[in-house]
């Protein structure tokens, strides 16, 4: 489907159709519009539009990459590549654009000036009619596939990390993985004759034209830098949409941080760490076990890091998706037993052919996402939770309610037993968890550090277990109460689509007990012995249920969901308690069926961004 189709070159009409206001225009009208357009070259660092200005033209990126920021000198808010429409709303509304737009590298845009558009529209009313029809047609619609390929990289630079050179076969292996999605070409200084006496001047107009021509003929260009800073290395880093640092890891868990190599220093200086990803080759003699990744990350605050394990072709395929802007993610957020709902949702989207490239979670969803990132089957994850919470009765010891309702000692031992003592950076796929930090009042993002800590901090809702106190004295609790959900780190990792799995608690309804009758009701309920059945008659939500409902808020989803993210909020059956762990498997199965039906309905309505990432075979 759309997400797995090979990239192809666009016709003039197709470039114009990336503009929402032109999408439904007849072909004849689009041709008249295209006649008013012209191509414009934009040099790296050149500001195309200043913040606060009314755009005098509409720009469609055909080659290169741009960044938006409040001022040209500020950090980027977003980056946009081929297919992106720049300042579209401000252009049509004749309003100031709130951010500056600057070229990250040498780029080419298709430019339609306002005066030309206005003159054509006045002479041909069908231009305005087509624009209005398009805007009405697209109003409120969620696209089933990316409307543009703004986040898809067209040029990739690969360079050595640490003191080693890039392995000889790396570029070929990466190209093979990319070829399943796009035609690509590998360019190096050797291929350009840079190694010959006299070499080739990279600023020669013929060379510049030839390089641009390669980008137009191939869908992806892989630029292999030299082992040290050279004019070619600098050119490759400047022209790349994505920079991939390649290191060879010896597998040692302990040791000093790996220092930056000269090409890495140049890459960070020219483009910043956010333009870079780190890929680590792992020594085949150490098998598939990954350890010691933090030694590499100490000096490299990269956008993401990836593991290339021996004989794991899928690792190269995943890296290719990240570099091309076609990777996907799964974010699970739910407290207590409601985490089973996120597991059922994952099982449903997996059955539909969707395989996420990265995982994240809060609350019980953090433990579930961690297990999935480790490669566990959803049903095995379900059985693990049942063993910990039902068979081993992790919360069987209540505590005097000074700090929490339950004693955490048994649960802590079971987490240490069933979850690996590993660093999050060593997981085979990108992962993070988010807990709520009571010490700072801010979300605590766990992308590095011990996996067991991330799981324990999120396991049970606040008040039920005491906060987890880490080695720095930070008090951490279940992050499913964070509003809005902390999905921003996932947006930094990938372009999407991302599946956001949540549990939707039903309202409690009106109380069956009058307020003045509460003391008598409480006395009746609390007077029974543990083995006795609850008294017949009206019931009220449990203390745990009230706590959960009071913190069940995510705000307006439009403010935090990405344009391709898909929220699946599974309805929880009325009366299900957040600590009803014996219902875990049943709740997972109910949610699985609900999610399958929901995916089918959304697909039939054309409202399924997820479909863009599902292969056709």
Task: Please give the residue ranges for each predicted region.
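Cytosolic regulatory regions built on CNB/CRP/Popeye-like sensor folds
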Residues: 1-168, 180, 252
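Hydrophobic residues at beta-strand termini and immediately following loops
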Residues: 40-42, 80, 112, 187, ...
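Gly/Ser-rich catalytic serine loop of serine hydrolases
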Residues: 51-57, 161-167, 334-338, 357-366, ...
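Flexible loop/N-cap segments at domain edges
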Residues: 204-206
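Walker A/P-loop phosphate-binding motif and the immediately C-terminal alpha-helix
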Residues: 150-199, 214, 319, 364
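Patatin-like phospholipase
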Residues: 209, 215-219, 228-359, 370-617
